[in-house]
């Protein structure tokens, strides 16, 4: 039997069928009326909702910016506590909210530090830490030791630069990743950690370690000083090393700042004061235009100097480099530096702390290198078959170039 698009048969229908159709039409009409009423109800609800949102928006616009942020966070928090099906990790939420604010402020160097992170930070800048006493780098899903602090638990256990750490507490480094592996190595003083190297397994007790961010050597009657970071003790140790070298008749120096991400302003200023003649070292300017100047005294070191830098040379290390260039005290070798021309301040919070970019800095020449960096006098890429941290002096072409310049 053929049907058209009405759904009604083309043949003659019986009276019973006609009644069914009438009943069906009546049902459709009732349903349509119900749907219409429901739609009107929904419309009323929606319009009422809009009126409520308008009121909220008006109150929102009248409040201060800080109040707005607090109000929105409270609203979201209440909604998630009422409706969210998952578990809330408030430690993580706190950190993400603060970091979200920093991202919104577009503070390139801003950072939130938890209570533990703050303690670790202050320990680091004061040349101490609790751990086993190694620095590591993550390569090819493994940890490689780049430095071992003297007399540390790692040093006493026979760990050497270049050693490969395969697992920590029976968990593979490849599965842990860099941060996970580092967190596993860290721990409370007096506790132990199990570490598997390529050729042996070790159980090491964590302890308070005095770190050193500076080391030195004499190569071909030239003083070589590697500065990894400008911490609270760097300037004093630097002066002691320089005095020792000069007492041995050394008057040519190489300062290796590759990988030096910066450090404390006071520390780098004191270090530069030892090297530079009387004059301006740096001036810093805050958001209100207030300027603070740091100057060197009349005493300074005479001699030839070379600074080696790379794209990881940043902040205080760039200030060190640029100040020596301004006074024509050093030749710079390497690749363009990072380009951090701001100083940050670590400010305590009720829980943890926050790093905020608070000043721009300018050297004697009036230069600020934010986003630009320093172009070396001699541009030279590092080229070697081995990573820099494992390279011998003879395998380091940038160091060899510095030695060549000073050996003339």
Model-derived segments and spans:
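Conserved PDZ fold ligand-binding element
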Residues: 154-177, 253-256, 332
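Extended, small/polar residue-biased N-terminal targeting/export presequences
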Residues: 80-144, 192-203, 211-216
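Terminal peptide-recognition signature
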Residues: 76, 97, 101, 134, ...
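Terminal targeting/pro-maturation regions of precursor/exported proteins
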Residues: 2-111, 141, 247
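Gly/Ser/Thr-rich loop/hinge elements
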Residues: 202, 210-214, 240, 261-315, ...
